[in-house]
């Protein structure tokens, strides 16, 4: 793990900690157990994310890098911070993020042999030409027509259920919300 990533932990999650303090200060919701709150609560976060995403699009179209940074910060604040605290996922977001990162990186191949096997499999199943390129110490397989990354034969989907207890997974979250 890089030095920067080691600064993060289940207790120290930048963006989430700051939003938790903001919510406490302004009387907003901080949940500490997994939950799907009432629709008006999650709809607010959803709409806010869409608003910030639109600001990002406009900033890009206008070529305004300062506004791009502002939009990215706002998106992170709302989606990562508010979303995490609203749904009671503070203790899960960082290990879940690491699992997603590991899954994303499993799209690459560790060896040239693995890359060649991936090309053979993806070319056959998709009927498309593929090639690989060495990037650092990894091999990335691309669909040749558009450079779409092809998943390695050793790709794995992230298992986010591992971050929930049996009781949390068995709970019917819709039963306690107003939809």
Regions found by a protein language model. Name each.
Residues 2-72, 76-179:
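Flexible "arm" and connector segments at domain edges
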């Amino acid at each position: 793990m890089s030095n920067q990533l080691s600064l993060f932990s289940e207790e120290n999650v930048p963006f989430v900690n700051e939003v938790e303090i903001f919510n406490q200060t302004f009387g907003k919701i901080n949940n500490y157990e997994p939950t799907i709150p009432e629709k008006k609560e999650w709809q607010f976060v959803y709409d806010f994310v869409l608003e910030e995403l639109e600001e990002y699009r406009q900033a890009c179209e206008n070529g305004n890098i300062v506004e791009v940074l502002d939009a990215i910060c706002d998106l992170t604040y709302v989606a990562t911070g508010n979303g995490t605290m609203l749904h009671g996922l503070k203790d899960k977001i960082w290990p879940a993020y690491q699992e997603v990162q590991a899954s994303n990186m499993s799209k690459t191949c560790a060896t040239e042999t693995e890359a060649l096997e991936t090309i053979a499999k993806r070319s056959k199943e998709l009927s498309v030409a593929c090639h690989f390129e060495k990037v650092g110490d990894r091999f990335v397989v691309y669909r040749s027509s558009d450079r779409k990354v092809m998943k390695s034969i050793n790709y794995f989907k992230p298992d986010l259920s591992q971050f929930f207890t049996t009781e949390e997974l068995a709970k019917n979250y819709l039963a306690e919300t107003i939809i």
